[in-house]
From Swiss-Prot:
Function: Essential subunit of both the farnesyltransferase and the geranylgeranyltransferase complex. Contributes to the transfer of a farnesyl or geranylgeranyl moiety from farnesyl or geranylgeranyl diphosphate to a cysteine at the fourth position from the C-terminus of several proteins having the C-terminal sequence Cys-aliphatic-aliphatic-X. If X is Ser, Ala, Met, Cys, or Gln, then the protein is farnesylated, if X is Leu or Phe, then the protein is geranylgeranylated. The alpha subunit wraps partly around the beta subunit forming part of the active site.
PANTHER family, alphabetized: PROTEIN FARNESYLTRANSFERASE ALPHA SUBUNIT/RAB GERANYLGERANYL TRANSFERASE ALPHA SUBUNIT, PROTEIN FARNESYLTRANSFERASE_GERANYLGERANYLTRANSFERASE TYPE-1 SUBUNIT ALPHA
Name by which UniProt lists this protein: Protein farnesyltransferase/geranylgeranyltransferase type-1 subunit alpha
Keywords noted in UniProt: Cytoplasm, Magnesium, Prenyltransferase, Repeat, Transferase
Gene encoding the protein: RAM2
Highest classification ranks of the organism: Eukaryota, Fungi, Dikarya, Ascomycota, Saccharomycotina
Organism the protein comes from: Saccharomyces cerevisiae (strain ATCC 204508 / S288c)
SUPFAM superfamilies with a match to the protein in the record: Protein prenylyltransferase
Catalytic activity: L-cysteinyl-[protein] + (2E,6E)-farnesyl diphosphate = S-(2E,6E)-farnesyl-L-cysteinyl-[protein] + diphosphate; geranylgeranyl diphosphate + L-cysteinyl-[protein] = S-geranylgeranyl-L-cysteinyl-[protein] + diphosphate
Length: 316
């Protein structure tokens, strides 16, 4: 704040000073001064370097203040138009934003602001965004805001070349990382028209290998189902996938449905759920689906028994 003079600005009040307020917020004097100055400058529509500095000070103490983010964007857009080098100016703004991002990993205003800056940028670069994205996901591999922004970047730049390998690395690190599995599916959905049969076969093997490592992991089973549905018109894997899934349920389908105590343990309830869904799509195998859902309700996933009964009723 020392760099700029605000003595000509009369701060506007941020408190009502009404009688008998139910819960008066105890603002610090510094906070009231910052917000009062901001209100005054916004009312004057001042788009200046000192206004930009003020927004940085406020974001430092109140990083979720959407109005200030919007005001900062208006300032940046105006000052960019007066800059001799708009690329350099916006890159400096992105550098500042990187620091704010690292200190506020759960702040969602940051990401919409980044999007607005990239849309404004004459020559935006996905390569420039990758380091900050990696740092943020390394810090919290399930940070929803970061994953959403990464998806946005892929679509904005029409660039998916890094995504499959990146998702693979994260899955190798943590096979339960559902965010990485979801991002992997995002890649296939957007690249499906340029994928070869060999690549599809390799991906199917990748999925089965990961299931083999941890059969009772819902993420790859859900992914397998989505992958099969996405490419059902290009490859016929039904028998291979069914044979693979049945290796995790033993001979439970050949046994009479009795009490839970009489039924054996199986390696994966998610394999049984996958098979039930698969069999339910074919009238010739619906009896198998009904039995699989019944087994899930009775023994292998009773916490969701109402769901399994609902699915049985739909089949019947």
């Amino acid at each position: 704040m020392e760099e700029y003079d605000y003595s000509d600005v009369k701060p506007l009040p941020i408190e009502t000073d009404l009688q008998d307020e139910l819960c008066r917020i105890m603002y610090t004097e510094d906070y009231k001064r910052l917000m009062g100055l901001a209100r005054a400058l916004i009312s004057l529509n001042e788009l200046s370097p000192r206004a930009l500095q003020l927004t940085a000070e406020i974001i430092d103490v109140a990083p979720a203040f959407y109005t200030i983010w919007n005001y900062r964007f208006n300032i940046v857009r105006h000052m960019m138009s007066e800059s001799e080098d708009t690329v350099l100016y916006l890159n400096k703004e992105l550098d500042w934003l990187d620091e704010v991002t690292l200190n506020n990993p759960k702040n969602y205003q940051i990401w919409s602001y980044r999007q607005s800056l990239l849309k404004l940028h004459p020559s935006p670069s996905f390569k420039r965004e990758l380091p900050i994205l990696k740092l943020m996901i390394d810090d919290d591999s399930k940070n929803y805001h970061v994953w959403s922004y990464r998806k946005w970047c892929c679509l904005f730049f029409s660039d998916f070349q890094h995504e499959l390998a990146y998702a693979s690395d994260l899955i190798e690190t943590d096979i339960y990382n559902n965010s990485a599995w979801t991002h992997r599916m995002f890649y296939w959905v957007n690249a499906k028209d340029v994928i070869s049969k060999v690549e599809l076969a390799d991906e199917l093997q990748f999925i089965m290998d990961k299931i083999q490592l941890v059969p009772q992991n819902i993420s790859p089973w859900t992914y397998l189902r989505g992958f099969q549905e996405l490419f059902h018109d290009r490859l016929q894997w039904d028998s291979k996938v069914v044979d693979f899934a049945t290796t995790f349920i033993g001979d439970v389908l050949s046994l009479p449905i009795g009490s839970p105590e009489d039924l054996p343990e199986i390696e994966s309830s998610y394999a049984l759920e996958f098979l039930a869904y698969h069999w339910g799509a074919d009238p010739c195998t619906r009896d198998n689906a009904v039995k699989a859902y019944s087994l899930l309700a009775i023994k292998y996933d009773p916490i969701r028994k109402n769901l399994w009964h609902h699915k049985i009723n739909n089949l019947n």
